[in-house]
Amino acid sequence: MLRTTRGPGLGPPLLQAALGLGRAGWHWPAGRAASGGRGRAWLQPTGRETGVQVYNSLTGRKEPLIVAHAEAASWYSCGPTVYDHAHLGHACSYVRFDIIRRILTKVFGCSIVMVMGITDVDDKIIKRANEMNISPASLASLYEEDFKQDMAALKVLPPTVYLRVTENIPQIISFIEGIIARGNAYSTAKGNVYFDLKSRGDKYGKLVGVVPGPVGEPADSDKRHASDFALWKAAKPQEVFWASPWGPGRPGWHIECSAIASMVFGSQLDIHSGGIDLAFPHHENEIAQCEVFHQCEQWGNYFLHSGHLHAKGKEEKMSKSLKNYITIKDFLKTFSPDVFRFFCLRSSYRSAIDYSDSAMLQAQQLLLGLGSFLEDARAYMKGQLACGSVREAMLWERLSSTKRAVKAALADDFDTPRVVDAILGLAHHGNGQLRASLKEPEGPRSPAVFGAIISYFEQFFETVGISLANQQYVSGDGSEATLHGVVDELVRFRQKVRQFALAMPEATGDARRQQLLERQPLLEACDTLRRGLTAHGINIKDRSSTTSTWELLDQRTKDQKSAG
C-alpha cells in the first residue's frame, strides 16, 4: 500500500510569487458593487477589463469579464479522472474551452495561467485497477498519458501546469485541517471527515441553489446529516491509502480541486471551468470549501460551464456510464481534429450539441469549401484563374464589416456561431466574384483584396486552432514543402503537354484531323495522370486550356473520387 507522512501546510502558492496572483492586490470595489442572479449576490471584481461579456453561472447572466491582475488571468480547469480512454463528450468540453482560452489570449490580449487537476486516485480507478489486476498508480499513469496524447491530437493547448492529486496529499490534508479548525467539518470514529453543510446556513448554494439530499446513503453512514459530503475517506481493505490525523485513507473528490486550485492561486480565482454536469455538486462544494478555508465572501469570480454532447436523437449525454460514447482515438480514424473543432465552433459553448456522422460531414464539407475558396483566391492572385471584373470596393467593405462582426461576436460570450456565419458570408461573396469566365476582365485585376481576405481567414482560424492549410496540403514532419514543390512541377509539365495537345493546328482538312488524332494520346495521358494522382489524394483542376491548379483531398473525398 502507498503511505506518506503528513507534510507542511499549504505554504506559499506555487506560482503566486512569480505571477503576482492570489489574494494580494485584489480588493472589493468601492461600495461593493453587486449584481444578483437567481437570488444570489455577486461581487464584481476590479482589475483589468477584458472587453468581453461572459455568461457567469454564478449569476445566470452575462457579466463583464474583469480579471484581477493585468499581467495574467487565473484559470482552474477540472481535469480527468484517469481510469479509461477519453471520449468525445470530454473532447467537446476541452476543445470548447481551448477555443475560449485562445480567443482571450490572441484577440483580447489576456495572458492566462491555467491549472488542471488530475484525479489519479478514485473509486473508479481502484475498481478498474482491480479488474485489470494492476496497481491503481499504474492504471492512472497509463490513462493520464493517454489523455494527454488525445488532447495533443485535438490540438488542445496544455495547461500551464498539471497537478496530480496523489502528489499533493499533504496540502490536501492541511486544507481539510483548516476547514475543521473553522468549525465547518468534523471527523468520525471510523476515520472519515465530512463537511458540515448545515454550518454554512444559507451561504451554501451560490451556484445552483440546490442542497443535496439523502439519496443513496448507506444505512451505516457515520455522517451527522445525510447531506454532508466527504473530505477524507477512511481506507477500506486492499485500497490505496495515505496516513492522516484521522487514520489511513484518501481524499474526497471535491476537496482535491479546492486544495490544488488554492495551492496555486490562493484565495482568489478569476475563472473556473468544466462541463455543466460538474456544476452540482462538484463546483458547488468547491465554493463552500474554499470560502470557508479562505474566510472570503467570493472565491471564484466566474464559473463557465460547457453543454453536454449528445448522441443524435438521444436525451442523455455521451458518457462511459451509459456506454454510448465514441473514444477520441476512434473518432480521429475518420475525421480530422480540425473538423471536430469546426463542429464545436458552430454551436455556443454553453449549449448541448448533437453528435452524428451527418453533422460531422457537414462541418467537414464547410471546412473543405473554405479551403477550396482560398485555393481559388490564390489561383486568381497568381493569374491562373480567369474571371470577370471583380467588385473590389464591395469586397473591401465586406472584409471590414466581417472583421467588426467577428470581434463583436467574440466579445459577446464567445458567440462562435455568429462568427462562423460571418466568415462563411464573406467566403460566399468572395466566391461570387471568382466565377470563371472565358472573357477577358473589363477592368484591372484586383488581387490585393483577395490577399487580404486570405490573410484574415488564416489569422482567424489559426487563432481558434484550425489550420486551413491542412485542407489543401499535408501536415506532418515538414515534408509538405517538398511534396508541394514536386507536385507543382508535375502539374506544370502536364499543363504544358495539355496546352500543346489542345492548341488548334494550322493545317486544314485531312492534315488537321491527322494532327488532332496524333495529339489525342497526349490528352488521354494527361487524364490518366490526373486519375492516378486522384487515387493518391491529389486533385488537379483544369481551369482553362492553359492553366491548372491542384489540391490535396481528405481521405473520404479521395475515396469518393477514386470510386467514381
Swiss-Prot record:
Motif ('HIGH' region): 80-90
Any GO molecular function: metal ion binding
The keyword RNA-binding belongs to this UniProt entry's keyword annotation: no
Top-rank taxon: Eukaryota
Binding site for Zn(2+): 78, 257, 282, 286
Protein residues bound to L-cysteine: 79, 119, 282
Main localisation: mitochondrion
Biological-process GO terms, alphabetical: cysteinyl-tRNA aminoacylation
Sequence motif 'KIIK' region, residues: 124-127
Subcellular location: Mitochondrion
Co-factor remark: Binds 1 zinc ion per subunit.
InterPro entries named among the record's database cross-references: Cys-tRNA-ligase, Cys-tRNA/MSH_ligase, Rossmann-like_a/b/a_fold, tRNA-synt_1_cat_dom, tRNAsynth_Ia_anticodon-bd
Recorded GO CC terms: cytoplasm; mitochondrion
Written domain comment of the UniProt record: 'KIIK' region and 'KMSKS' region are required for cysteine persulfide synthase activity.
Main function: Mitochondrial cysteine-specific aminoacyl-tRNA synthetase that catalyzes the ATP-dependent ligation of cysteine to tRNA(Cys).
UniProt protein name: Probable cysteine--tRNA ligase, mitochondrial
The organism of origin for this protein: Homo sapiens
Gene: CARS2
